[in-house]
Amino acid sequence: MAIRYVRKIGDEVLRKKAKPVTEINSHILTILEDMAQTMYLNDGVGLAANQIGVLRRLVVIDVGEGLLELINPEIVYEEGEQVGAEGCLSIPGVVGEVKRPKKVKVKYLDREGKEREIEGEDLLARALCHEIDHLNGVLFIDKAIRFLDEEEKEQVKEV
């Protein structure tokens, strides 16, 4: 396992669409482990593979309920609406309000290659949407309704 460099805004890999994983092998599992370690070290709640320069459809998320590893995630259902603050390890110092579904259902493969589904609400729904957007070359700044000023960012940190 290794800590990977998180690509920053301006790096063209962040704007590219990731390719599906066709075989789950030791290389893919190592990437997932590296992604989790990198996410935790950087105090993130999610990380997509292209954020570490790997154009494969891999996502790790932990919103405080344990690590989720998703291979080839796809949103199959969404409902409701929520607006909330988002930041990104690839866009340090920027926080914006983004409209997302309140609830989503995501189909994905686990590390054994079994098809799974997960339902997420609130923060988990937001994280799933944010990371899957990354896999499609979309950043939260593309969807932000507005950006928070320094005082507002401090208030968000305190919550």
From Swiss-Prot:
Binding site for Fe cation: 88, 130, 134
Cofactor binding annotation: Binds 1 Fe(2+) ion.
Record has Metal-binding as a keyword: yes
Function of the molecule: Removes the formyl group from the N-terminal Met of newly synthesized proteins. Requires at least a dipeptide for an efficient rate of reaction. N-terminal L-methionine is a prerequisite for activity but the enzyme has broad specificity at other positions.
Protein name: Peptide deformylase
Gene3D superfamilies in the record: Peptide deformylase
Gene Ontology biological process terms, A to Z: co-translational protein modification; translation
UniProt entry keywords in alphabetical sequence: Hydrolase, Iron, Metal-binding, Protein biosynthesis
E.C. code: 3.5.1.88
Species in which this protein is naturally found: Thermoanaerobacter pseudethanolicus (strain ATCC 33223 / 39E) (Clostridium thermohydrosulfuricum)
